[in-house]
Amino acid sequence: MAKPKKKEGFLETIKTIIFALILAGIFRTLFFQPFWIPSGSMKDTLLIGDFLFVNKMSYGYSYASCPTVRIAAIGLNIEAEDICGFLRGGNKRILGAEPKRGDVVVFRHPSNGQDYIKRLIALPGEKVQIKNGLVFINGTPVEVISDGTFDEVKAPQGPFRNMPRCANEVVEQNGICKKEKFVETLPNGVSHSILNFMRQTVDD
């Protein structure tokens, strides 16, 4: 007599888990999504291994915001087209808001599909150039002021065990890795830290 109850209890548990996963997926897609930092391109604002939640409501929702939902176990297969097809074409957004200079944003690369976490320094229609390592927006150089150095231990960082790049002379394992630190101020007055990794081809 107890077996049917156990079976019913098991099925209820499975239903609860599936329902919780669906709710978590909706919450992750529409409201907040967790990210961790895999590289040092945003030092010293964001460090390798840092964990953050991204507010997906900041700039509203577009066609690209909608998910494709597939749960093979229950035969659920909902395409993004079925959910947000009415938003296709142009730059249609719901509850849209314009991004601002200095915002740290997450976007999906259109070619490889990877998520990138970067800082927004220019707005649509503006011309951005890099000359001798300096950023120019519409032909005007962005203000840069020296702010000492950023020091860290030369040791594997994060899940990928990346080694930090050093601007000082050859640094042994567990030595102090130094990079020049600057404060960059954008045209709207927003400031942030940047690091100099030595001169390289992308400086021009």
What are these regions (language model features)?
Residues 2-14, 35, 44, 48-204:
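Soluble "head" domains of membrane/secretory-pathway proteins
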Residues 12-30:
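Hydrophobic membrane-insertion alpha-helices, especially the h-region
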Residues 26-40:
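Aromatic-capped interface at the extracytoplasmic side
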